[in-house]
Amino acid sequence: MSAPSGGGEGGGKESAAGGVSSSSLAPSSLPPPRPKSPPEYPDLYGKRREAARVQMLEREIGFLEGEIKFIEGVQPASRCIKEVSDFVVANSDPLIPAQRKSRRSFRFWKWLCGPCLSLVSFCCCCQSKCSCHLRKPKCCNCTSCSCIGSKCCDGSCCSNICCCPRLSCPSCSCFRGCWCSCPDMSCCIPSCFRSCSCTRPSCLNKKKSSCCSCNCKIRWSSCFSCPKVRLCSCCFCNCKNLCSNPCCLAF
């Protein structure tokens, strides 16, 4: 009876050993662990980017082709402009007068003859020895000159023999060797004062002691003794009392 017990014990040990061995061999029978699928390889040569660019270009080319087809169907603008111009030429504007051409010719002749007439109106002849010339602002009135047998226009054909008043001063009576009776001294031509004794207009209503008198000499450059006047062109000044205004006549 002892044998079976021993055998039973031995069998139990074997079974236990077999269970342990089976449990130890179970994990080894499973497949080895595998890593996950690796990521896709990078685009080393840029093929995908180039393919995307090609697609974009093809799309743009398609858009451009569609626009070209649309433009080909449109009528050219030059034809429309020509049609409009032909219509305007054929149908005259009712607001434009029919006598426009004659007015243009009248304006042209008016523009051409206007300056000529204005130039002719300024021409004046002095005496037989004077040639015709354009009047200047300083040209005197030849008809009012009292010097007989002499030239009278100051400026272009004038001699110092005769002194005439300006056109703007008809009441001026300036003659050679006389006293100037002009109401305003600026009315007389400077060549008239070579041998006359004059008084400034601002000193006519004042006392002689408070004003200056100008004694004219023959030479124009003999007039630099007046301290207040530097540009004295025709007079030699003898001043008793210095006036607030220059004592010489400046022209």
Swiss-Prot record:
Q: Where is this region: Disordered?
A: 1-44
Where do Pro residues bias regions lie? Answer: 29-41
GO CC, any one term: plasma membrane
Low complexity biased stretches: 14-28
**Where is it made, tissue-wise?**
Expressed in flowers and siliques.
Q: Where is the composition biased (Gly residues)?
A: 1-10
Q: Where is the G protein gamma domain?
A: 46-126
Subunit structure, interactors included: G proteins are composed of 3 units, alpha, beta and gamma.
> Which organism is this protein's natural source?
Arabidopsis thaliana
Q: Which InterPro entries match?
A: GG3-like
Q: In the record, which residues receive a covalent lipid, type S-farnesyl cysteine?
A: C248
Free-text function comment from the UniProt entry: Guanine nucleotide-binding proteins (G proteins) are involved as a modulator or transducer in various transmembrane signaling systems. The beta and gamma chains are required for the GTPase activity, for replacement of GDP by GTP, and for G protein-effector interaction.
Put simply, this protein is called Guanine nucleotide-binding protein subunit gamma 3
Q: What happens when the gene is disrupted?
A: Leaves with a roundish shape as well as rounder and smaller flowers.
Biological processes, Gene Ontology terms: response to abscisic acid; signal transduction
Keywords attached to this Swiss-Prot or TrEMBL record, sorted alphabetically, are: Lipoprotein, Methylation, Prenylation, Transducer
Cysteine methyl ester modification sites are C248
Q: Please give the SMART domains that the UniProt record associates with this protein.
A: G_gamma
Whether Lipoprotein counts among this entry's keywords is yes
Which residues comprise the propeptide? 249-251
